[in-house]
Amino acid sequence: MNNILVINGPNLNLLGKREPDIYGNITLENINQKIKLHFKNEDLKIDFFQSNEEGKIIDKIIESEKKYNAIVINPAAYSHYSIAILDAMRSINIPVVEVHLSNIYKREEYRKKSVTAEASLGVISGFGYYGYIMAIEFILNNLVREK
């Protein structure tokens, strides 16, 4: 069985209320339910973690190597400046795919750079919650090929 951890960064717990013109009306809980439903027939366990605190996200990334085959991460605002999260991602030996709900390249100038992307297999941006599903599909296909 594959185990995948989905990490969500700061303010994503406010989805559904925060900037619905950018992020829509869907809540983080709804996103998590849609992900689980999409993969219900897979031999797959998906855990979800959200924190507004950089240190807790770093700890979760570092601990993940013991329990998970891969990480899907939406570092949110931390993606633009957190060298600490980048270093944590680089320190583990499991694949990481970065996801952003909105298209960061159509947003403010400071959002167009993701430092954490340097430690990711790839970045999926602008497809809403479906970006998480795309990331997990990629990971599953990648893990199957490696076996």
From Swiss-Prot:
Q: In which pathway does it act?
A: Metabolic intermediate biosynthesis; chorismate biosynthesis; chorismate from D-erythrose 4-phosphate and phosphoenolpyruvate: step 3/7
The answer, when asked if Lyase is one of the entry's keywords, is yes
Member of which family?
Answer: Belongs to the type-II 3-dehydroquinase family.
Query: Which segment of the chain is annotated as a signal peptide?
Result: none
* Residues annotated as catalytic: 23, 100
| Recorded name of the encoding gene | aroQ
Fill in the subunit field for this protein. Homododecamer.
Protein name (database record) = 3-dehydroquinate dehydratase
The top EC class, named as a word, is lyase
Please give the CDD domains that the UniProt record associates with this protein.
DHQase_II
Which GO BP terms apply? amino acid biosynthetic process; aromatic amino acid family biosynthetic process; chorismate biosynthetic process; quinate catabolic process
Which reactions fall under this protein's catalytic activity?
3-dehydroquinate = 3-dehydroshikimate + H2O
* Classification via NCBIfam families: aroQ (TIGR01088), PRK05395.1-2 (NF003805), PRK05395.1-3 (NF003806), PRK05395.1-4 (NF003807)
Lineage, uppermost ranks: Bacteria, Bacillati, Bacillota, Clostridia, Eubacteriales
Q: Which GO terms describe its molecular function?
A: 3-dehydroquinate dehydratase activity
Q: Which PANTHER family match?
A: CATABOLIC 3-DEHYDROQUINASE
Q: Name one Pfam family in it.
A: DHquinase_II
The record lists the organism as: Clostridium botulinum (strain Kyoto / Type A2)
Keywords noted in UniProt: Amino-acid biosynthesis, Aromatic amino acid biosynthesis, Lyase
Q: Where is this site: Transition state stabilizer?
A: 18
Q: Where on this chain does substrate bind?
A: 74, 80, 87, 101-102, 111
